[in-house]
Amino acid sequence: MDPNTPADFFKGSSKFHTYYSQTKKGGGVIDLGLSLRTIQHETYLPPARMIGLDGYGELIDWSQPSYNSITQLKSEDTGHQRLAQGYYNNEGESRGKYAYVKVNLDGLVVGRKVCLVDQGAYATLALQLNDMFGMQTVSGLRLFQTESEFSLVYRDREGIWRNVGDVPWKEFVESVDRMRIARRNDALLPF
């Protein structure tokens, strides 16, 4: 303990009585080392003398951007503004329950969900799926490449399994229900 600390520093606070014990001889404090929290000293200035927030009114009055403006900026950056506006209403809530689609990799028990509104094309979808599942394979997924051992298939709302990339992106996003990353030799088998 700091020798400059007054001996009655811990006397006034009842919250330290279980962690510190005073001796009868010297009136000093023995640290029992039982505290798991840090000691927070009182403020040096009383509340009446606190420093004002003059000049910081602009920061305090600054409003957070709305969800719609963020969605619009995001969709303008990726080039799929119309698609993003179709999935969100004015309150920012998802209108379509198919904005998030579950993706499973053969051999893994747990699947993951992907937001198709955040993707602008098949290439960005393949990159995100490679980031999610690529570490589970020796050579990565390499989806949509001829030398890949994996194929990406999807089930549409009618329950028919199809190859991803056979239809235009917008039609794919509107009809997809679930996706599966299958080994190429397994992709030929009926589901």
Curated annotation (Swiss-Prot):
Induction record: By auxin.
Single biological process term from Gene Ontology: embryo development ending in seed dormancy
Subcellular location: Nucleus
Span of domain PB1: 98-184
Intervals of motif EAR-like (transcriptional repression): 32-36
GO cellular component terms, semicolon-separated: nucleus
An example molecular function term from Gene Ontology annotations: DNA-binding transcription factor activity
Chief localisation class: nucleus
Keywords for the protein's UniProt record, in alphabetical order: Auxin signaling pathway, Nucleus, Repressor, Transcription, Transcription regulation
Recorded superkingdom: Eukaryota
InterPro entries: AUX/IAA_dom (IPR033389), AUX_IAA (IPR003311), PB1-like (IPR053793)
Residues spanning the signal sequence: none
Domain free text: The N-terminal half of the protein contains two conserved domains I and II. Domain I includes a slightly degenerated ERF-associated amphiphilic repression (EAR) motif which seems to be involved in the activity of transcriptional repression. Domain II is required for the correct degradation of the protein through the SCF-mediated ubiquitin-proteasome pathway. Interactions between Aux/IAA proteins and auxin response factors (ARFs) occur through their C-terminal dimerization domains III and IV.
Assembly mode: Homodimers and heterodimers.
Primary role: Aux/IAA proteins are short-lived transcriptional factors that function as repressors of early auxin response genes at low auxin concentrations. Repression is thought to result from the interaction with auxin response factors (ARFs), proteins that bind to the auxin-responsive promoter element (AuxRE). Formation of heterodimers with ARF proteins may alter their ability to modulate early auxin response genes expression.
Family: Belongs to the Aux/IAA family.
UniProt-recorded name of the protein: Auxin-responsive protein IAA32
Gene designation per UniProt: IAA32
